[in-house]
Amino acid sequence: DYVLKQVASRYHQMGWPTNGPGSEGSVLPTSYQTEELQRELIMLACSFGNKQCHRQAVAYISDWISSNKNRIPPNIRDIVYCTGVSLMDEDVWEFIWMKFHSTNAVSEKKILLEALTCSDNTFLLNRLLNLSLTSDLVPEQDVIDVIIHVGRNPQGRSLAWKYFREKWDILNARYGEALFMNSKLISGVTEFLNTERELSELKEFTETGGIGAGPALPRALEIVEGNVRWHRLHRRQFYQWLRKPPSPTFG
């Protein structure tokens, strides 16, 4: 609610690009700065549950499915795809999965793959994790990004963390020689861990299972210890502060 109240007036003022179905926005901005501001406001509004933003994203996805023409403006496709996958049913996830396999555009392929990790359906997230590592349906260079992005999804955090530990030997055998890949994976999967249980699991993994991880695990342990400490000391105070009426930020 805090973020929505902060951005609501400016979001409704800026609106959406008007070349899509049922668009409720203003004329497509011409300056780069204005276009980026519009994109940021749409991202915040959709991420934090603005109902009009959700309706617009769903309308874009529905139009794409029914017409087989993608009229979603390129600069907000990642937001619309992710929002649609998170709100709509399994058929939409399958549609995005199909488009991921049928497109040859590298940048579009990346956006579609990331959108698949936005689902609230843990079955689909688990399916994607398993497909990424045990089949050739996901390019080998994208497997680490899939695991990381599932971990950044609140519904997928524990799934990705569990999957990482269970499949560590396979992951390390495949990517271990590229230390930067291991470091990216470890930091990406652990950066949002913040409970005492997760900290204990990380400590246990560091002591018994993280062979070949190098210096990335000790760094991750420091970060998670900091996360747990912050939550213990400041979480209640932080939520109390968020409940206070916000002072106007945007005109």
Which residues fall in each region the model found?
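Long, ordered, helix-rich scaffold segments
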Residues: D1-G251
